[in-house]
């Protein structure tokens, strides 16, 4: 099934808006969350086809939310791409170990982002 609904998780309203606008202009339905806690709740309610997850957020960070979403029975099938400024190899490895399927470093290149999103079609 092609990716149609994407959840954008980022505590920055600007980042959420930029990603949401890019994805909508490219034919995707977008839902957004501003925290790890909200992402977990919304993942169960919305059942998106893909999640773009920031790492650095107050409260529950993106690694913790990814681990929870990727282990919950109702949501473990949803692929997660980490989108973060944390660019060290150890950060990428840790993200993948928490259940992320891919990892993009900010600032995001829109062409690369759309290619990665499209690879889940």
Model-derived regions: residue spans:
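Charged docking surfaces used in two-component/phosphorelay signaling
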Residues: 17-25
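Short hydrophobic/Thr-rich beta-strand motif most characteristic of the beta2 strand and flanking loop
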Residues: 27-34, 42
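Active-site beta3 strand of CheY-like receiver
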Residues: 46-52
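Receiver (REC) domain active-site loop signature in two-component systems and cognate sites
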Residues: 57
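Short, glycine/charged-rich "phosphate-handling" switch motifs in NTP-dependent
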Residues: 101
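C-terminal output helix
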Residues: 108-117
